[in-house]
Amino acid sequence: MYVIDPIADMLTRIRNANNARHEIVDIPASKMKKAIAQILLEEGFIKDYEIIDDGKNGIIRIRLKYGPNKERAITGLKRISKPGRRVYAGKDELPRVLGGLGIAIISTSKGIMTDKKARKEGVGGEVLCYVW
């Protein structure tokens, strides 16, 4: 299946599985999606993820994280830069999500990273999405 915006598709799959309280969600893999999954893991939004070889690009299997009473670790996901309207931010205008409680995932010349790391590295880039 061909998808126009693979990152929006990934975020939608995670959002839907999260709202339905599923434990795992499978997403078609790509380098960028693997980098986003790694950031979600490092920031504590997911339990873990694994790459499953299917003979093509592979599949990312994400294990979602919930609290003791099934409270969601991910409250919201929002795609910012879209194929029809790219959104870029310089190093001095990187967004803060919910006053620092959430993260912005930025695609920079030094790779995909959070807004906090991009500020520390002193780089700007394309604002892919917000997670809170």
UniProtKB/Swiss-Prot annotation:
Q: Which InterPro entries match?
A: Ribosomal_uS8, Ribosomal_uS8_CS, Ribosomal_uS8_sf
The protein's UniProt keywords, in alphabetical order, are: Ribonucleoprotein, Ribosomal protein, RNA-binding, rRNA-binding
Q: Does the keyword Oxidoreductase apply?
A: no
Query: For this protein, what is any one GO molecular function term?
Result: structural constituent of ribosome
Q: Name one GO biological process term.
A: translation
Transmembrane portions of the chain: none
Give any Gene Ontology cellular component.
ribonucleoprotein complex
NCBIfam families noted in UniProt = PRK00136.1
What is the role of the protein in this entry? One of the primary rRNA binding proteins, it binds directly to 16S rRNA central domain where it helps coordinate assembly of the platform of the 30S subunit.
Q: How does it assemble?
A: Part of the 30S ribosomal subunit. Contacts proteins S5 and S12.
What PANTHER family is this protein classified in? 40S RIBOSOMAL PROTEIN S15A
Query: Can you tell me which family this protein belongs to?
Result: Belongs to the universal ribosomal protein uS8 family.
Name recorded for this polypeptide? Small ribosomal subunit protein uS8
- Which species is the source of this protein? Caldicellulosiruptor bescii (strain ATCC BAA-1888 / DSM 6725 / KCTC 15123 / Z-1320)
Gene name of the encoded protein: rpsH
